């Protein structure tokens, strides 16, 4: 008998497995696709690899203004091969860790027979606990027209060649990333969002800033717009367009079998499986983590949920805390947000940061929010925003006062100095802005 059977080896499942196994638990992981889940195989890793390559192309194209002349030619077959090699290397790393910790990996599709029995490849696995970590899948687009043109945020990585033009449907974080990356790699891009601004659910000023930068890069951004695909025609509002590919980026949905859950008596809704703060379902020995739990579709949240579930299975009381979840969007420039965007706020422009000027990219800003002398939230738009947000996340988590960060000496010249200057601005003591 296993102590735990985990279904799914994505960032939730594999982290949970390792957290359990290193404490001596007998763990079996069932995975029907590749190790690392959507994040490694079809999400975070391949998109960020392409984002890095797009950044190289962008810098090479802008190098002439710095006195560096170069001709840019993209061989997508090589780029794609290197991307897949990176994915394979990281997935292999997870497999290596499984062997190191004695975690049994079974390839196949799991069928949950009871809360103590899982069937895989006609073999029954008996277990004390079950962890569901089956992730999510892209939402489909309600159209039967032009199937040869439509790709999802998963299937786009299977394309052998870069399309000349792409219509991206959905201006959330995934749609904005793909629009930016594909544009950087030379594709003509239309980006359509039904809501008033890009990145719906986030402060409008952020979506507006990204829209401005995208338009400057030549992307056709259409917020508060509708799309219709019918009779072999693609209409944005009343305008007909003819993209080579149509990328559907309208979100994801939990990947579970509702009939199976109902038979087991596990509570769920359209957002995901219902869990408590310990990641338990209504069946005390069945846990749900990652996208399937429906809280956040973020790999770093999934991994943390995996650790929390593991600790509770091991008898160490642990609860999820979602108050300081960083949210990053890998556009050009990047966006990073953490905490509450409310209270007294001040903004510091990246153009006043020395390192941003050295990098040749001064777009964006750092905006900080405080209440009763405690840092509440931070918004960063700019080069390497995803790297800077970690310090803000820690400061908010520890309930630090702005002066606690200000009185910490920061290296110069660095981008995090912009965070310090923004904090100084809260009481009018900024050094590098008026």
Show where each model-derived region lies.
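Flexible, glycine-rich terminal cap/loop adjacent to redox cofactors
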Residues: 2, 7-33, 45, 49-56, ...
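FAD-site-proximal beta/loop scaffold in flavoenzymes
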Residues: 147-163, 241-312
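Glycine-rich dinucleotide-binding loop and its adjacent helix/turn
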Residues: 44, 134-188, 192, 262-264, ...
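A conserved FAD-binding loop/helix module that cradles the flavin
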Residues: 209, 289-341, 412, 416-434
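Glycine-rich flavin
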Residues: 2, 18-25, 30-162, 190, ...
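Beta1/beta-strand and adjacent pyrophosphate-binding region of the FAD-binding site
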Residues: 1-12, 162-172
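Short glycine/serine/threonine-rich phosphate/pyrophosphate-binding segments
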Residues: 12-16, 38, 150, 175-178, ...
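Short hydrophobic core segments
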Residues: 5-7, 110, 125-135, 168-169, ...
């Amino acid at each position: 008998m296993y102590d735990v059977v985990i279904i799914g080896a994505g960032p939730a499942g594999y982290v949970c497995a390792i957290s359990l196994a290193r404490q001596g638990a007998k763990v079996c992981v069932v995975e029907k696709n590749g190790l690392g889940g959507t994040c490694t195989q079809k999400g975070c890793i391949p998109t960020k690899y392409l984002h890095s390559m797009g950044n190289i192309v962008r810098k090479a194209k802008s190098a002439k203004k710095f006195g560096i002349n170069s001709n840019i030619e993209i061989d997508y077959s090589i780029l794609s091969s290197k991307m897949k090699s990176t994915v394979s290397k990281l997935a292999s790393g997870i497999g290596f860790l499984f062997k190191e910790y004695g975690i049994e990996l079974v390839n196949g599709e799991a069928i949950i027979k009871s809360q103590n029995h899982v069937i895989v490849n006609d073999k029954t696995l008996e277990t004390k606990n079950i962890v569901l970590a089956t992730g999510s899948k892209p939402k489909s687009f309600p159209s039967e027209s032009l199937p040869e043109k439509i790709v999802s945020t998963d299937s786009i990585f299977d394309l052998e060649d870069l399309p000349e033009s792409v219509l991206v449907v959905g201006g959330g974080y995934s749609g904005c990333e793909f629009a930016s990356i594909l544009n950087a790699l030379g594709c003509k891009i239309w980006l359509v969002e039904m809501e008033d601004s890009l990145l719906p659910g986030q402060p409008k000023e952020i979506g507006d800033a990204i829209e401005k930068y995208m338009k400057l890069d030549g992307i056709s951004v259409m917020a508060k717009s509708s799309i219709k695909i019918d009779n072999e025609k693609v209409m944005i509002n009343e305008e007909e367009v003819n993209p080579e590919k149509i990328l559907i980026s309208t979100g994801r949905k939990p990947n579970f079998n509702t009939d199976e859950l109902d038979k087991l008596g596990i509570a769920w809704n359209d957002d995901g499986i219902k869990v408590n703060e310990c990641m338990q379902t209504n069946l005390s020995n069945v846990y749900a983590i990652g996208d399937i739990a429906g809280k956040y579709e973020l790999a770093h949240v999934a991994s943390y949920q995996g650790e929390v579930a593991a600790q509770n299975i091991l008898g160490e009381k642990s609860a999820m805390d979602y108050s300081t979840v960083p949210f990053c969007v890998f556009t050009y420039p990047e966006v990073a947000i953490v905490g509450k965007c409310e209270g007294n706020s001040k903004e510091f422009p990246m153009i006043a940061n020395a390192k941003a000027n050295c990098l040749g990219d001064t777009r964006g800003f750092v905006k900080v929010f405080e209440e009763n002398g405690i840092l509440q939230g931070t918004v960063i738009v700019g080069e390497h925003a995803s790297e800077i947000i970690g310090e803000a996340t820690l400061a908010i988590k520890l309930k630090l006062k702005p002066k606690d960060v200000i009185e910490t000496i920061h290296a110069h010249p660095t981008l995090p100095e912009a965070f310090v200057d923004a904090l100084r601005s809260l009481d009018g003591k900024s050094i590098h802005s008026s």
